[in-house]
Amino acid sequence: MSHVAPPPSLGALGFLVGRFRGEGTLQRGATFEKDVVGRWEVAGHFLSLSMSASYRVNDRVMDVHHAMALVGVERGSGAFQAHVFTDGGEILEHRLIVEDGRITFGDRVPHESRARVARKILLRTPYGYDETLEIDRDGGGFETYSFVRLERIAE
């Protein structure tokens, strides 16, 4: 049996490994809670991220969404590819741009935003990472739609 070492470039995603929790804000002023668990999978060849986000509907009701992402590196091109599985049964594919402590990718446009394009930015910080969702409504430039500071609570 032959084993292949994981691509060294995956190390750039290492800041996403661990347990993270944060409270975020939406552009319209509402808040939400997010939990993320990131871990290496399949002998370190892939990163999995299990996520849940809870949005308060009223004083007694929360709208909770779950998703899981698997991130790997395409052998031929060296590009970072993510497959995201949602609790709505969707499978989304994203190509990631990975720079020093920063990950950017095109994301789904929030349905109530009436935007044309959305992108997500994950930025490494001393406490974990920040996640920003930006939208472009009319081609005039991106604006922040949501922001959450995710603090590492466990390795």
Q: Regions from the language model: what does each represent?
A:
Residues 1-155:
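Hydrophobic small-molecule pocket/channel-lining residues, especially in calycin-type beta-barrels
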